[in-house]
Amino acid sequence: MRANPDLREIRDLLQRSGTVAVVGLSDRPSRTSHAIAGALQSFGFKIFPVNPNLRGPVLGEEPYESIQHIPTPVDIVDVFRRSGKVMPVAEDAVAAGAKVLWLQSGVINEEAAAYAEEHGLTVVMDRCIKVDYATLVGVS
């Protein structure tokens, strides 16, 4: 398995990022994606829900069908999809000009990670963005 950036680099990318597209965000508060997206908002990130099945706002934000539909630049693409469904997300992230492809804990796709890296994205795989932010940056 490819190596993630070291913890210092992960901390730095979290500190310099302000926008996160949350791919696979659910409108159900009981879902992990919902809880983590809410935490990202509390940390000060502007989130963009990306889920073509959503019909209304989630956590106060209008959903988008794809990353490319988001009208402002996205720093991090945080992925809550099954590992086998990540390649189209990586392609969308590259096409949208995102900087980081972040695959949540349990999400591993070496092919998608290699594709994203070949196109200049930093890739973090099989890690929780909420835990890493709280641990590496801290919560005030």
Predicted segments — roles?
Residues 20-23:
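Conserved beta-strand elements of the Class I
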Residues 43-45, 96-100, 119-121:
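A short helix->loop->beta-strand "cap" motif at the edges of active sites that frequently abuts
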Residues 26-31, 38-58:
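NAD(P)-binding Rossmann-fold cofactor-contacting core
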Residues 105-133, 138:
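Rossmann-fold NAD(P)-binding glycine/threonine-rich loop
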Residues 1-5, 57-64:
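Short gly/ser/thr-rich secondary-structure transition/capping motifs
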Residues 1-16:
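Short N-terminal or domain-adjacent regulatory/targeting segments
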Residues 67-107:
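Mid-chain, well-packed structural core segment of small domains
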